[in-house]
Curated annotation (Swiss-Prot):
Residues 255-269 have a biased composition (Basic residues). This is CENP-A histone chaperone scm3. One of its GO terms (cellular component) is chromosome, centromeric region. InterPro entries: Histone-fold, Scm3/HJURP. Gene3D superfamilies: Histone, subunit A. It holds the Pfam family Scm3. Centromeric protein that plays a central role in the incorporation and maintenance of histone H3-like variant CENPA at centromeres. The keyword Protease does not apply. It is found in: Cytoplasm; Nucleus. GO terms for biological process: CENP-A containing chromatin assembly. Its main location: cytoplasm. Residues 243-269 are annotated as: Disordered. The gene is scm3. It comes from Schizosaccharomyces pombe (strain 972 / ATCC 24843) (Fission yeast).
Amino acid sequence: MCNRQPKAVDLPPNYSCPHLLSFQSVEFNTNPTACDDVFCKRIESEKKYNDFLESLFKKYGRDTSDIADEVDLATGEIIVNNGHLEALKTKDDIWDPTFNNLEISASNGYEKKLDSSIGNPGEKAVSPVHIEDFQSPQIYKFKNLSLRDEMVSDCVFADEVPLASLFVENVCNETIPSQSCVRLKINDKTRKVDASALEKKSCLLPNSSGTLTDQRGLDTIKHKSIEQNEILHVISDTLSSPRRRNPLLSSPKTPLRRSFSKSKVRNSNSTKRRNFISLISMISPRPNLSTHHFNLGFQPLSQQTSFSGSSTQNPHSSSTCKKAFCFQCISESKKC
């Protein structure tokens, strides 16, 4: 901890101050603060650390230039060989004499990994097409096992077909297992659509050779574009309609739920109107709702006609009025 002594400050001879005219020097008594203590402790700890490192180097440090290995960084050759690098060397290192070139070693390692990924020599050879099929997405849930056996593992889609059509087959198999599906092949891209919807749109079926032919045996090369548009239209119709409105995709076990919020609002509005009508029925004569600024959009015509008919035949009188609260009776009593 450092202790600072008060210092005397000498003012210049031409210094003029109205409050210090009778003083030649000013003394400032400065006491050390917490910041000063922290600053002094940091200086002392840094000096102690430097002294400790210096003592370590003096005790254990030595010059290793005479025993170390020296390597030329440009060529990678060992200029001064004292055996240190040779002891650390392995057969897979870059400077191993069996591998003179880095590119040859890298290519050999890649070929080994490729051979191990394909399989043993005794196994069946795997073509690059099968490797792409293995990496392609697949559908794993099937209710109909025959469709699973017939399905091609390659699931490449055309740009015109939406991506959501991948799940059409899975949804049909889950909801309606007995629904028959027909597989169509468009430009080597497999699709399955509903048979009932297909009969309405087209009469084309696949043959054993994989090409589309007409039921009457006609050539369909001229109708290729028309056929593709029809099939895409069937798929888009199946996917565009929501699941709750499509009877083929909606499950019979789960009925449609009625919105609770809408029914609550409807009940509250009907309750307000019913209470308002019951309140109006206590008032006579009945007011015209169209004259008020809070017009509710309805008017009890039947009650107005009955009142108008009764008013012409039986005029109102306080003696014959049976209502508990009547404005007309009160107004007549005030006039009297």
